[in-house]
From Swiss-Prot:
Residues 127-140 have a biased composition (Basic residues). The chain crosses the membrane at residues 31-50. Pfam families: Sulfotransfer_2. This is Uronyl 2-sulfotransferase homolog pip. The keyword Chloroplast does not apply. The gene is pip. Interacts with wbl/windbeutel; the interaction is direct and does not require pip to be folded. GO terms for molecular function: endopeptidase activator activity; sulfotransferase activity. Disruption phenotype: RNAi-mediated knockdown in females targeting all isoforms, or a combination of isoforms A, H, J and I only, results in dorsalized offspring. It comes from Drosophila melanogaster (Fruit fly). It is a single-pass type II membrane protein.
């Protein structure tokens, strides 16, 4: 083939190749329009569907916020009391969430941020009205002491609770000393973040046990909340978990508010006792660190304020109560009152404005000694702040103390939740608490129980409710905190069916030496 012929052949071959490579396949005009319309339709559908899905997710987020409580089976019946007049905002799960939000508890998982803010406020300059007796040198000394206890964090997470079995004596809130402290300093706590095995992050943030500086539990028990049963349980757990327990000496009258010297003497005595140990007494909250002494683990129990008043009214009108005091205290016991006093029912007492049943707002010393102030046991020893009855200021101070100082504040109204939280947050003392409780439930449920009681009318309950507004708010606050602690442990799920413990049948001989 000649050179020209070969070149012509190659050019034709290249033209064919280019024609094939850059070929254009014709489409009907209608097909192009359909494809464009389909693309636009798909884009619009995806946009609308995504927007609707986003709105639905936001709605579900709000509805599912309290899911940790619904997973626990906590409904309005668990949170509210018997009466119809209770706060509407916690009678539903969504209401519970809104209540927690309004009190700052739902964002309470940012406890480290809160504590950091409090630390800044508690410097000698910013907090001078609380620390006008402390120098900058002492502030640095206290910080060094707190830092020195950091290495105990994992051990301190395993501390806490009270003991013993004894009847509650009639008590008076009036202090038997002239001097009552006027300043009840807040405690500056170190912030720990170390988790131990079995703890999740949220539970750790709600656990104050790790801030304890000594292996000692202080149970400043509130009267008529079932503290005798808890002390009996502690007596049994002491044999299992290896700690000692004690309570104050019985007396005809209890001193709830003490002056500074008596507080110091009591603390010094308690800190010299062999450890680990627990101590219980009817006494208002004591701030150990204001005496430059190590902080213990604080625990307590609460009860519906209306039920407490009903319980107290009939407790001091039970003949066996005075016979028991006579047997224990002899000639120092209070004599049995008149028959008229013993037979006075609460409905009549409230209706006739008897001094025993008159609830004057902001009253500092009521005519008769009783236990109408549950907040006092958490507010502290500042008589001017904490003694006025149903005081909002006392209630707010009590809330703050519970949130920053107390490891656990439980209630027998939620037995399984309380025992579960105690076991998990203070295992050093409460390990096996549920087993011990259910094995001895018959005995524990009868400790100090008063069968001398009567039905109280709805009218009387309503009158009490109107006069105990801040006491009731504090009680509800403590229950919400307890539920949060439990929910944090369970990751929003049940531990078991209602967290009931299945205990195998046992012979009764354990009652003798358990």
């Amino acid at each position: 083939m000649s050179l020209n012929a070969e070149r012509s052949y190659k050019m034709k071959l290249r033209d064919v190749e280019n024609a094939f490579k850059y070929r254009r396949i014709p489409y009907p005009k209608r097909s192009v329009e359909l494809i464009a319309l389909l693309a636009i339709s798909c884009t619009f559908f995806l946009f609308m569907h995504t927007n609707k899905l986003n709105s639905r997710l936001k709605e579900m987020e709000v509805k599912l916020q309290p899911s940790e409580f619904s997973a626990l089976g906590l409904t309005g019946n668990h949170i509210s009391g018997h009466d119809a007049g209770k706060h509407d905002d916690i009678n539903t799960l969504h209401g519970t969430y809104q209540y927690l939000k309004s009190t700052g508890q739902k964002v309470g998982y940012n406890v480290h941020d809160r504590r950091s803010s409090e630390e800044q406020l508690r410097t000698p300059t910013a907090h001078g009205h609380h620390h006008d007796h402390h120098s900058h040198h002492h502030h640095m000394h206290q910080q060094e002491k707190i830092d020195g206890h950091k290495h105990k964090a994992s051990h301190d997470k395993q501390l806490a609770v009270p003991d013993n079995k004894h009847k509650e004596d009639e008590v008076h809130y009036e202090d038997d000393e002239d001097e009552v402290e006027e300043n009840d300093d807040d405690l500056a706590n170190d912030v720990g973040t170390t988790d131990s095995e079995g703890f999740n992050f949220k539970a750790d943030l709600l656990n104050n046990t790790k801030y304890a500086e000594v292996d000692f539990v202080f149970f400043n028990r509130v009267p008529k909340v079932g503290s005798q049963s808890l002390m009996e349980l502690m007596a049994r757990l002491g044999k299992i978990n290896g700690f000692t327990h004690a309570r104050n000496k019985g007396s005809a009258h209890e001193t709830i508010v003490m002056n500074k010297q008596r507080q110091n003497d009591l603390i010094a005595d308690l800190l010299t006792r062999p450890k680990p140990h627990i101590y219980s007494q009817h006494i208002a909250y004591i701030n150990f660190t204001r005496f430059h002494l190590p902080k213990p683990i604080y625990i307590n129990l609460i009860r519906d304020p209306i039920d407490r008043i009903i319980s107290w009214h009939y407790y001091i009108r039970a003949p066996w109560y005075y016979r028991d005091m006579q047997a224990k205290l002899g000639e120092n016991a209070i004599p049995m009152p008149s028959e008229e006093f013993m037979n006075l029912d609460l409905d009549t007492c409230v209706r006739n404005h008897d001094p025993h049943c008159t609830f004057t707002q902001m009253q500092i010393k009521n005519p008769v000694g009783d236990h109408r102030r549950q907040t006092l046991f958490f507010c502290g020893m500042n008589q001017k702040l904490c003694m006025p009855f149903n005081s909002e200021a006392a209630m707010q101070k009590a809330k703050r103390t519970v949130e920053t100082e107390y490891a656990v504040v439980g209630t027998w109204e939620d037995t399984n939740i309380t025992l579960s939280v105690l076991e998990a947050y203070i295992p050093r003392y409460f390990r096996n608490a549920k087993v011990a409780y259910y094995l001895g439930k018959d005995r524990l449920s009868r400790v100090n129980r008063n069968n001398v009681t009567r039905i109280v009318s709805d009218e009387t309950r309503l009158i009490l409710r109107k006069n105990l507004t801040n006491e009731i708010e504090f009680y509800e606050f403590c229950k919400q905190r307890l539920y949060l602690q439990y929910a944090a442990l369970s990751h929003g799920k049940r531990f078991g069916e209602d967290d009931y413990l299945l205990v195998p049948e046992q012979q009764n001989e354990y009652n003798e030496d358990y």
